[in-house]
Amino acid sequence: MTIRNQRFSLLKQPIYSTLNQHLIDYPLPSILSYWWGFGSLAGICLVIQIVTGVFLAMNYTPHVDLAFNSVEHIMRDVEGGWLLRYMHANGASMFFIVVYLHIFRGLYYASYSSPREFVWCLGVVIFLLMIVTAFIGYVLPWGQMSFWGATVITSLASAIPVVGDTIVTWLWGGFSVDNATLNRFFSLHYLLPFILVGASLLHLAALHQYGSNNPLGVHSEMDKIAFYPYFYVKDLVGWVAFAIFFSIWIFFAPNVLGHPDNYIPANPMSTPPHIVPEWYFLPIYAILRSIPDKAGGVAAIALVFISLLALPFFKEMYVRSSSFRPIYQGIFWLLLADCLLLGWIGCQPVEAPFVTIGQISSFFFFLFFAITPILGRVGRGIPKYYTDETHRTGSFS
């Protein structure tokens, strides 16, 4: 190949070379398990949500008198509209399932530790953006649960000292949840997924700066292989399993993860007996309800994300992987069970004994983050698998 042909070769073009560097030739530890495939699955979920959302927006009308009927029009009259809506609605649930598994994998293998602090913090920001996007999207069908969920959650901003009431009025566009609120939420719901794409690309770039963690929790530049074709084929297994799982929900149980009250048009004069958010908000909602004071509940929610953001900056542990930390491993599984319990409590009425159980579960949730720095310094177990760098430096960083 001549010098001129080399200059104009496809491999030399900036866009292709970047894709080749991050998606094809990117080196990964050879011992990665299937738990490392949820990042790519999250990307697939985000693409599904954006594509289906754009087509749904073509037929949706953001007006309080027309929104509910426009959703029914999509379901009944638009060609393939039912499939678009069920893919979008259940796709949100799949997205959160994948991301929750991704987060818990990071907690189990301490993927947040140095030098990947920025990767973890970006992931927490992405998680927060997902919650905001999903919440305002849940309002758009303008059913009973949409309307009253928007009323309850947005009114929480009034707990902010001095400016709280002003923020609530600004969010509503008036003195109650109404047409201005719906228009604002529709605009934001269309915008935020593209911000999520940008944040995800930053997350990926930050990850590739230092490379992925591995099940052993030790650093090595020696035993690595290219993403393509090895991990592409490995991830492909997860993609197929995900497609089957996703299809079961779409075609056989499309409304199971929703709430039947949302098939009733919004009525400001009739309050549902029990206001429940989508299932993926339930653990956080349970923490919010476990504190009777509104300001305390809002502070607890803020503390959830502050705890996640602060996790990488605790004192570094001797060994990252929970495979060699039996005490932390036991506490981790208790945390997982606690989060499932919080999810169940979140959909129960605000009465005894559910309130008490929610308070105990919320206490343990925060206790986990409080004792994690201590657990990082006890139960030291040295892996038998050393890399050349570990021998040379005597560290597991």
UniProtKB/Swiss-Prot annotation:
Residues where a ubiquinone binds: 208
GO cellular component terms attached to this protein's record: mitochondrial inner membrane; mitochondrion; respiratory chain complex III
Family note: Belongs to the cytochrome b family.
Function recorded in the entry: Component of the ubiquinol-cytochrome c reductase complex (complex III or cytochrome b-c1 complex) that is part of the mitochondrial respiratory chain. The b-c1 complex mediates electron transfer from ubiquinol to cytochrome c. Contributes to the generation of a proton gradient across the mitochondrial membrane that is then used for ATP synthesis.
Binding positions for heme b b566 per the UniProt entry: 102, 203
Binding-site residues, heme b b562: 88, 189
Assembly: The main subunits of complex b-c1 are: cytochrome b, cytochrome c1 and the Rieske protein.
Superkingdom of the source species: Eukaryota
Name of the protein in its database record: Cytochrome b
Entry's Gene Ontology BP terms: mitochondrial electron transport, ubiquinol to cytochrome c
The UniProt record lists the keyword Cell inner membrane: no
Note: Heme 1 (or BL or b562) is low-potential and absorbs at about 562 nm, and heme 2 (or BH or b566) is high-potential and absorbs at about 566 nm.
Keywords: Electron transport, Heme, Iron, Membrane, Metal-binding, Mitochondrion, Mitochondrion inner membrane, Respiratory chain, Transmembrane, Transmembrane helix, Transport, Ubiquinone
Record flagged with keyword Membrane: yes
